[in-house]
Regions:
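FAD-binding core of FAD-dependent oxidoreductases
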Residues: 1, 44, 48-50, 216-223, ...
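Non-catalytic terminal extensions of PLP-dependent enzymes
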Residues: 14-20, 26-45, 49-278, 290, ...
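Short glycine-rich loop/turn motifs that provide flexible caps or phosphate-binding loops at active sites
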Residues: 61, 218, 280-283, 336, ...
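Structural preference for beta-strand elements that scaffold enzyme active sites
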Residues: 133, 215, 357, 384-388, ...
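Active-site-proximal helix-loop-helix substrate-binding element of RNase H-like nuclease domains
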Residues: 471
């Protein structure tokens, strides 16, 4: 009943054309890139990478392992509860699993406990009312339990006896105790040795195409290299073992990294303040709009509630504006993909008394450097409103220009795009916001610092664990390297545009005839003349070993391509060869040389099981389907399923039984 109201991504079952079950992203038309201001949420970054890690944990341990771990955690918690009560502490949680909270005896203070705990290198939770608490997890062993005992015993002036073992005990009331089985699917009951688990993960890995195989040309996504040197800190416990709420003097290294990174981002954006708190670009948009609202309220302009957004903007812009409590007003774009200046002036004038902000992307979502960008900012400022710059395309700005110079007041950055932290598989994302001087006082705070204004994340610095990646990227590249990367990103996009302009054609170009860091390939004429859609081209690319570009965004019936600076000339040339060979295949359909109802494009992709089948009833050869050009032979990536039935997947979102569509 409510499936279309669910936020974020939904993965559901469907079947390919041969009846093989498969997964796909379902009900995509309900998401913000289609629904825009009518979307349920602005969520883009699903953080699926973290969910995958948790999933592997459950797969490896299974029901029995998880139960054993949980029982051990709870037993230690029960033991500590009983022992601390003997010391005069009162445990206030009637029902608990792993977390205890104690009222202290009259002669014991929280500061006493804090002093003793710190001397033993233990951090506890200290509540405002003087209570003290802690949580147990699977890393807590008998030795750690003895340390906790000693802290509370010493504070209370009690003797304590070290224990060598803790018996299995339960204090969970039967009314809330689970009795039904869980993790019953076969995947949670097969891979309980490291060898089997390793092979299972590798089998899954072989089904995914990634930058390890070839360029991922997704427009507006900036799928660049995540260099090994930048990733190394993620394996260091000094970074990964840090709790986000530890005392400041225990995180001096992190604080220095955060300070230096923030200073770097200020210089890069031309702004005066930074918050690293937002956990995604969409969260950054929301946070930035909250900052604008807080500023307007502070100067008596809190009635301003309208946000002007170009029609070309990414769908998260209007979705975030709605989430932040604003009303959106759409501004038209001209035939060249630029903001229609006449319409902008009219909309700004009509709404000037209520206008809070303009949200604009630069270069535009059409991949164009709009020459009027500074004039656009001036028009908005003249109305008393602020300019929010979407930093999704910052990869075409770094070192050449910046939002501050252009005239924006706030922007977000996608560290998982422009600044090289992992992007595929759902993040984890970081979407810091950078602001001009007058907005600095309204940046997100956090309760740990005694100021929770505009807080958008549970942790004060968001996903701080992956900040070392961006820090390493910026420091190793330096100003000259970052600028060169921007130039190469723009050069690569224009190289592809030049190579493909005489076949497919490029939808938009800037005033000087060039594109920005990405370009939109025209596919609508192909569909009219040959009956081949942009979807067919994207599916056929899989046979050549390439991930699909961005389909039908921001223009329906097109493909948006962004090569990034990471790709070599050899890889760009190979991609061009592939696209030109697909163009040749399209012409074969158009000219009647290939069957319009049975050709390599409308039947793509061709999985291995189809190619090796005894049954082959197509009008073209197996070789043409699987090895259309010589370069594919050296690095063939076999797609796992044939073309998927999208309608079935949306209509039958969940099977009634596992593996069936009855």
């Amino acid at each position: 009943e409510y499936k279309r109201n669910m936020p974020g991504r939904i993965i559901g079952w469907s079947k390919d054309k041969y009846g093989k079950l498969c997964y796909r992203m379902a009900l995509q038309t309900r998401e913000q890139h289609i629904k825009r201001e009518k979307a349920t949420s602005n969520i883009c970054t699903a953080q699926a990478l973290l969910a995958t890690m948790a999933g592997f944990y459950a797969v490896y341990h299974g029901q029995e392992g998880i139960t054993t771990i949980a029982s051990r955690i709870h037993s230690i918690t029960v033991f500590l509860d009983k022992q601390l009560k003997k010391f005069g502490y009162t445990q206030v949680n009637a029902q608990y699993f792993d977390t205890l909270r104690f009222e202290l005896p009259e002669h014991v203070s929280a500061q006493q406990i804090r002093t003793i705990a710190l001397s033993k290198e233990v951090n506890l939770r200290y509540f405002e009312n003087g209570n003290v608490g802690f949580s147990i997890d699977e890393t807590t062993d008998v030795a750690a339990a003895n340390v906790l005992l000693s802290i509370f015993a010493i504070a209370a002036g009690k003797d304590y006896q070290k224990v060598d073992d803790i018996p299995e005990k339960s204090n969970i009331d039967k009314t809330v105790k689970r009795t039904t089985p869980f993790l019953t699917h076969e995947v949670f009951n097969k891979y309980h040795t490291e060898t089997e688990m390793m092979r299972y993960i590798k089998r899954l890995d072989r089904k995914d195409i990634s930058l390890a195989q070839s360029m991922i040309s997704l427009g507006s996504c900036t799928m660049k290299l995540n260099a090994a040197a930048e990733m190394l800190p993620l394996s260091r416990p000094e970074f990964m073992g840090m709790h986000p709420l530890v005392p400041e003097d225990q995180a001096e290294g992190y604080r220095e990294l955060i300070k230096n990174l923030s200073e770097d981002l200020k210089v890069i954006t031309g702004f005066a303040g930074v918050s690293l708190q937002p956990n995604s670009g969409a969260a950054g948009e929301y946070a930035g709009l909250r900052v604008i609202r807080a500023y307007l309220e502070s100067i008596g302009q809190g009635h301003r509630n309208k946000v002007l957004i170009p029609a070309s903007a990414h769908g998260t812009n209007p979705a975030s504006a709605i989430q932040a409590g604003f009303v959106t007003v759409t501004c038209a774009c001209d035939e060249q993909g630029n903001v229609e200046m006449a319409d902008l002036r009219v909309k700004a004038e009509e709404n000037k008394d209520e206008l809070a902000a303009l949200m604009i992307t630069y270069p535009s979502t059409h991949g164009i450097f709009e020459t009027e960008i500074k004039e656009i900012c001036d028009i908005i400022h003249a109305c008393g409103a602020q300019v929010y710059m979407d930093g999704a395309n910052m990869n075409a700005q770094v070192g050449l220009t910046n939002p501050g110079f252009i005239g924006a007041d706030v922007c977000h950055l996608n560290l998982h795009k422009t600044f090289a932290s992992p992007h595929g598989g759902g993040g984890p994302g970081v979407g810091p916001i950078c602001v001009a001087e007058h907005l600095v006082p309204f940046l997100p705070g956090h309760g740990i610092f005694g100021n929770s204004q505009n807080q958008v994340s549970a942790a004060p610095f968001g996903s701080a664990g992956i900040l070392p990646i961006t820090y390493g990227y910026i420091r190793m590249m330096g100003a000259e390297g970052l600028t060169q990367a921007t130039k190469i990103a723009i050069l690569n996009a224009n190289y592809l545009a030049t190579c493909l302009k005489d076949t497919y054609g490029v939808v938009y170009r800037g005033a000087n005839g060039f594109v920005g860091h990405e370009m939109i390939l025209e596919c609508r004429k192909v569909h009219e003349e040959a009956g081949i859609s942009e979807n067919d081209i994207a599916k056929r690319l899989m046979d050549y070993g390439y991930h699909a570009p961005t389909l039908s965004f921001p223009v329906h019936g097109t493909l948006m391509i962004e090569p990034t600076e990471s790709e070599s000339l050899a890889e760009l040339d190979n991609f061009v060869d592939v696209m030109l060979n697909i163009w040749k295949e399209i012409q074969e359909v158009k000219n009647g040389e290939a069957d319009k109802d049975d050709n390599v494009l409308i039947n793509a992709p061709h999985p291995e099981y189809e190619i090796v089948s005894d049954r082959w009833e197509h009008s073209y050869t197996r070789e043409k389907a699987a090895y259309p050009i010589e370069s594919v032979r050296d690095n063939k990536f076999w797609i796992n399923v044939a073309r998927v039935d999208n309608t079935l997947g949306d209509r039958k979102l969940l099977p009634t039984r596992y593996g069936t569509f009855e």
